[in-house]
Curated annotation (Swiss-Prot):
This is Protein RecA. Keywords: ATP-binding, Cytoplasm, DNA damage, DNA recombination, DNA repair, DNA-binding, Nucleotide-binding, SOS response. It comes from Listeria ivanovii. Pfam families: RecA, RecA_C. The lineage of its organism: Bacteria, Bacillati, Bacillota, Bacilli, Bacillales. GO terms for molecular function: ATP binding; ATP hydrolysis activity; ATP-dependent DNA damage sensor activity; damaged DNA binding; single-stranded DNA binding. The gene is recA.
Length: 348
């Protein structure tokens, strides 16, 4: 047994000498046993994710039909990162980002790094450079479907380019995944939906870009509109369901229901009323909502309005709900450069 241990110790020394300190270690000695997260900007989604937000150093895929709220979900996460003093980058391959809308959601557009690349290769090379800098806390790519390979852009209309985009994504993710993990960057890939032709049984919907992103993603979120939210005859927004289709850090298949209001994004008051009523932080009796024996509104919309006007009570309820769901922020780490992240470029 001693000979085996001596041989193992010798092998470990050789590995550390060749590849550097920390290249191999016992799992229990690893400093990051608890998953460090950054809030998604939505209380309901933080709860559905099971760990209180998006895990750092991981790849997230957000997909769904057109105008379902995918970019809104990503922009809320960017606003949350910036609010904590972090740096965020947005690679706008669709060339469709609305700065005014982003500002309404709380994004500091003066500090947001923005790139509008010409080709898929350029977009992914920029993404790699940002990740390897070790100074970017969140990177959003909108969208995978718009990452058009250079050969397709330079070719003629009607030319066949079978599997080019899938190969591009597969190669990029092989290079990016390790750097994303080391730099603790959250990489959010927004994706669209396509339909297979001639599928008789099962779900015909697929996401572009091949299978690689599905495998490399720690979390996959499906965003879909459930119903319209009306005030009289005017449509004010959509009730949206965000389903955690894949989750490697907590149980999957949980669903977050949020109100996405036009021009405002996710209604924090709406989801707070729902989540607080679920755990009896807010009491619902008939159509009346009350908090600590005090009525805060008749009907959900009035309760939302009350919380919007009384931010101190809203923050108090939010804190209590997070404690009930055990996502009180104890697994958060400060957003700061570390020796490990800053040495990423030197490793090249």
């Amino acid at each position: 047994m001693n000979d085996r241990q001596a041989a193992l110790d010798q092998a470990l020394k050789q590995i550390e000498k060749q590849f550097g300190k920390g290249s191999i270690m016992k799992l229990g000695e690893h400093s990051d046993q608890n998953i460090s997260t950054i809030s998604s900007g939505s209380l309901a989604l933080d709860i559905a994710l099971g760990v209180g937000g998006y895990p750092r150093g991981r790849i997230i895929e957000v997909y769904g039909p057109e105008s379902s709220g995918k970019t809104t979900v990503a922009l809320h996460a960017i606003a949350e990162v910036q609010a904590q003093g972090g740096t965020a980058a947005f690679i706008d391959a669709e060339h469709a980002l609305d700065p005014a809308y982003a500002k309404n959601l709380g994004v500091n557009i003066d500090e947001l790094l923005l790139s509008q690349p010409d080709t898929g290769e350029q977009a992914l090379e920029i993404a790699e450079a940002l990740v390897r800098s070790g100074a970017v806390d969140m990177l959003v790519i909108d969208s995978v479907a718009a990452l058009v390979p250079r050969a397709e852009i330079e070719g003629e209309m009607g030319d066949a380019h079978v599997g080019l985009q899938a190969r591009l994504m597969s190669q990029a993710l092989r290079k990016l995944s390790g750097a994303i993990n080391k730099s603790k960057t959250i990489a959010i890939f927004i994706n669209q939906i396509r339909e297979k032709v001639g599928v008789m049984f099962g779900n015909p919907e697929i996401t572009p870009g091949g299978r690689a992103l599905k495998f490399y993603s720690t979390v996959r979120l499906e965003v879909r509109r459930a119903e319209q939210l009306k005030q009289g005859t005017d449509v004010m927004g959509n009730k949206t369901k965000i389903k955690v289709v894949k989750n490697k850090v907590a149980p999957p298949f949980r669903i977050a229901e949020v109100d996405i209001m036009y021009g405002e994004g996710i209604s924090r008051e709406g989801e707070l009323v729902d989540m607080a009523a679920e755990v009896d932080v807010i009491n619902k009796s008939g159509s009346w909502y009350s908090y600590k024996e005090e009525r805060i509104g008749q009907g959900r919309e009035n309760a939302k309005q009350y919380l919007k006007e009384h931010t101190d009570i809203r923050d108090e309820i939010s804190k209590r709900v997070r404690e009930e769901y055990e996502i009180d922020g104890s697994n958060k780490e400060p957003l700061a450069e570390t020796e490990e992240t800053l040495s990423l470029l030197d490793d090249e």
